[in-house]
């Protein structure tokens, strides 16, 4: 099928993301779970494809990401990788797969052998030794702080994080700890815009926001959300880019443009 052919643009690598941050070019990331969408998103200019454990929600109908398994992430990673996208492929480490550094490494190896070029895990200071262990063994790491969906029961629901002075201070410590341990990318979810801006200012590595304001180095959304495919109430940080567009490709291109020119997210999408 022609839509699975390689694109002509140069590969987006981990060093390329750092160069984009230093040049002030915004990074556009979307979740992706299969080869067809990987090819389409790559054609639209998306910089990074995240095989997120959000597949538990949007593909499997789960109420949380907790039931998603390593084998499932590996399967969808391989599907995305077969499209040979120029975009950087990042794969989530599911709940329970990185409790120890050794477990994290063994499971990260499986994802990278499936086609991941970077792995993402959720946590803060407590995760520093694991991140360091992975990076020392040539596993690029994207850390995820703020609202970490795998901690939904500990949080008592999907709630904005860092709203209190102590909570904000902890998120700053978590973010610095992840960078100091060697993480090369940081996702920040559902936190006050001012806090996310301060984290971005303090760190050297790129920050990717989802409900974290426009001052991050880039943005990520769940693909289904930005296409308007969400049951029930639309999350505050989501914009339906499919509205007014003639095709999915055009909608994704509109998302990329909005991220790059800083018009998304707007104040109505932030906390």
UniProtKB/Swiss-Prot annotation:
Cofactor (UniProt): Mg(2+)
EC number(s) on file: 2.1.2.11
Swiss-Prot/TrEMBL catalytic activity: 3-methyl-2-oxobutanoate + (6R)-5,10-methylene-5,6,7,8-tetrahydrofolate + H2O = 2-dehydropantoate + (6S)-5,6,7,8-tetrahydrofolate
Localization terms from the record: Cytoplasm
Positions of the catalytic residues: 189
Co-factor note (free text): Binds 1 Mg(2+) ion per subunit.
Pathway terms, separated by semicolons: Cofactor biosynthesis; (R)-pantothenate biosynthesis; (R)-pantoate from 3-methyl-2-oxobutanoate: step 1/2
Residues binding 3-methyl-2-oxobutanoate: 53-54, 92, 120
The protein's enzyme class: transferase
Residues engaged in binding Mg(2+): 53, 92, 122
The keyword Protein biosynthesis belongs to this UniProt entry's keyword annotation: no
Main location: cytoplasm
One record GO biological process: pantothenate biosynthetic process
One Pfam family this sequence matches: Pantoate_transf
GO CC term, one of those recorded: cytoplasm
SUPFAM superfamilies the UniProt entry points to: Phosphoenolpyruvate/pyruvate domain (SSF51621)
GO molecular function, one term: magnesium ion binding
Keywords: Cytoplasm, Magnesium, Metal-binding, Pantothenate biosynthesis, Transferase
Subunit text: Homodecamer; pentamer of dimers.
Protein family membership: Belongs to the PanB family.
Function: Catalyzes the reversible reaction in which hydroxymethyl group from 5,10-methylenetetrahydrofolate is transferred onto alpha-ketoisovalerate to form ketopantoate.
NCBIfam families documented for this protein: panB (TIGR00222), PRK00311.1 (NF001452)
UniProt protein name: 3-methyl-2-oxobutanoate hydroxymethyltransferase
